[in-house]
């Protein structure tokens, strides 16, 4: 989405959001930064190890699909141009993650989640609601989301085969970006979310990570 002060009509906004959805779900994402795993050799994985790596990288890819949807929903409803710019920058970095995960999945011979259209739609609606609740709570939603994502990624680093250095390097870089996104949201005026909202977010994330691992 635009990070300038231009005002879009409802129709313009709908077209832009539809385009963003189609690009995320059906396009080939282009990273602005170099893949951190570039130059690393392909590991010799057993069939079981490869299946495990595919599962976790598929989860990470779906997580990035959700991140794109969340940020676009929040961008569409952000009131402060500075907050909108923060979401725009974060979304661009999440596009890097999306591209890296998709590239790694292709290298492993895996497929992206067949449920990505559902993940995107659900996350976009959540992003809209978060944005409509006001910028402080919307920023709080980002901060809490990134905290939970960082925990998931740390868990993945414990479970991805130790010799799959390519997948591990990508996840490590993603983890650092997510931590920074959370810190940026906090420094921009994030308001802490209610406990029940945090628990609901964790439950939804658990559903996504469980299903995306297999489907």
From Swiss-Prot:
Protein residues bound to Fe cation 2: 94, 146, 178, 181
InterPro entries assigned: COQ7_proteobact, Ferritin-like, Ferritin-like_SF, Ubq_synth_Coq7
GO MF entry, a single one: metal ion binding
Cofactor(s) this protein cannot do without: Fe cation
Annotated GO biological process: ubiquinone biosynthetic process
Keyword Metal-binding assigned: yes
Cofactor note: Binds 2 iron ions per subunit.
Catalytic reaction(s) noted: a 5-methoxy-2-methyl-3-(all-trans-polyprenyl)benzene-1,4-diol + AH2 + O2 = a 3-demethylubiquinol + A + H2O
Pathway: Cofactor biosynthesis; ubiquinone biosynthesis
Residues noted as binding Fe cation 1 in the record, renumbered to the chain: 64, 94, 97, 178
Similarity remark: Belongs to the COQ7 family.
Reported function: Catalyzes the hydroxylation of 2-nonaprenyl-3-methyl-6-methoxy-1,4-benzoquinol during ubiquinone biosynthesis.
Designated name of the protein: 3-demethoxyubiquinol 3-hydroxylase
Species this chain originates from: Coxiella burnetii (strain RSA 493 / Nine Mile phase I)
Gene: coq7
